Amino acid sequence: MANLGCWMLVLFVATWSNLGLCKKRPKPGGWNTGGSRYPGQGSPGGNRYPPQGGGGWGQPHGGGWGQPHGGGWGQPHGGGWGQPHGGGWGQGGGTHSQWNKPSKPKTNMKHMAGAAAAGAVVGGLGGYMLGSAMSRPIIHFGNDYEDRYYRENMYRYPNQVYYRPVDQYSNQNNFVHDCVNITIKQHTVTTTTKGENFTETDVKMMERVVEQMCITQYERESQAYYQRGSSMVLFSSPPVILLISFLIFLIVG
């Protein structure tokens, strides 16, 4: 870990040194260096602004502002704003106005609410969280009747589980046991209030289904918890702290 931090420090120092040298190099071609000059001091080719010999500001035959034959603002034959023959805003021969643009699609608030609910602490359940939706597992119960019954009724069983953080349990079995009990209880109560009852076969199948989902949830949470712990160890090592301090010094300085 210390060697990794030292190599990261060397790499960032070299990178910031190159960036500092690039910032100090002069940029070519400033204002009034080559090309057309402003005003009226052009190159030998004579590209002046305003141009000489017609086309200037306020000239009778140019394309300037307010002229009878130009393409300026407010003219009957120009391409300006609000004209009958021009290509400007709101014209018969021009492009469509912004009023005709289709409105942007609205965000589906139900999808946003569902995404926000996953992984959030559920109120009134003593710190339990609701996991993300899962595909119900394919389970074989040992006989054709139960296998067929499960396939026909699996949509009635939960596809999300309730759980507490993994650091509150000493092992996987305790996590899964608690997860199965609270999930089946909540699903049964919610479904019963809608006028639907579960048979003993339903409860047996729900226990198997929810158990598999709770094991999957435990594996996900354990991996995330391990990654968070590894990140904390990495960023708390002295070489990384020194590197972060050095970067802050470069940015502020």
UniProtKB/Swiss-Prot annotation:
KW Signal (keyword) present: yes
Positions bound to Cu(2+) 2: H69, G70, G71
Extent of Gly residues compositional bias: 52-95
Annotated transmembrane regions: none
Region annotation (5 X 8 AA tandem repeats of P-H-G-G-G-W-G-Q) ranges: 51-91
Major subcellular location class: membrane
Positions of the propeptide segment: 231-253
Sequence repeat spans: 51-59, 60-67, 68-75, 76-83, 84-91
Gene Ontology molecular function: copper ion binding
A Pfam short name: Prion
Gene3D superfamilies in alphabetical order: Prion/Doppel protein, beta-ribbon domain
Residues lipid-modified (GPI-anchor amidated serine): S230
Stretch list, region Interaction with ADGRG6: 23-38
GO cellular component: Golgi apparatus; plasma membrane; side of membrane
Keywords: Amyloid, Cell membrane, Copper, Disulfide bond, Glycoprotein, Golgi apparatus, GPI-anchor, Lipoprotein, Membrane, Metal-binding, Prion, Repeat, Signal, Zinc
Membrane topology: Lipid-anchor; GPI-anchor
Cystine connections: C179-C214
SMART domains on file: PRP
Positions glycosylated per UniProt: N181, N197
Subunit comment: Monomer and homodimer. Has a tendency to aggregate into amyloid fibrils containing a cross-beta spine, formed by a steric zipper of superposed beta-strands. Soluble oligomers may represent an intermediate stage on the path to fibril formation. Copper binding may promote oligomerization. Interacts with GRB2, APP, ERI3/PRNPIP and SYN1. Mislocalized cytosolically exposed PrP interacts with MGRN1; this interaction alters MGRN1 subcellular location and causes lysosomal enlargement. Interacts with APP. Interacts with KIAA1191. Interacts with ADGRG6.
Functional note: Its primary physiological function is unclear. May play a role in neuronal development and synaptic plasticity. May be required for neuronal myelin sheath maintenance. May promote myelin homeostasis through acting as an agonist for ADGRG6 receptor. May play a role in iron uptake and iron homeostasis. Soluble oligomers are toxic to cultured neuroblastoma cells and induce apoptosis (in vitro). Association with GPC1 (via its heparan sulfate chains) targets PRNP to lipid rafts. Also provides Cu(2+) or Zn(2+) for the ascorbate-mediated GPC1 deaminase degradation of its heparan sulfate side chains.
Clinical disorder: PrP is found in high quantity in the brain of humans and animals infected with the degenerative neurological diseases kuru, Creutzfeldt-Jakob disease (CJD), Gerstmann-Straussler syndrome (GSS), scrapie, bovine spongiform encephalopathy (BSE), transmissible mink encephalopathy (TME), etc.
Comment field on protein domains: The normal, monomeric form has a mainly alpha-helical structure. The disease-associated, protease-resistant form forms amyloid fibrils containing a cross-beta spine, formed by a steric zipper of superposed beta-strands. Disease mutations may favor intermolecular contacts via short beta strands, and may thereby trigger oligomerization. Contains an N-terminal region composed of octamer repeats. At low copper concentrations, the sidechains of His residues from three or four repeats contribute to the binding of a single copper ion. Alternatively, a copper ion can be bound by interaction with the sidechain and backbone amide nitrogen of a single His residue. The observed copper binding stoichiometry suggests that two repeat regions cooperate to stabilize the binding of a single copper ion. At higher copper concentrations, each octamer can bind one copper ion by interactions with the His sidechain and Gly backbone atoms.
Descriptive protein name: Major prion protein
Species name: Pongo pygmaeus (Bornean orangutan)
Lineage of origin: Eukaryota, Metazoa, Chordata, Craniata, Vertebrata
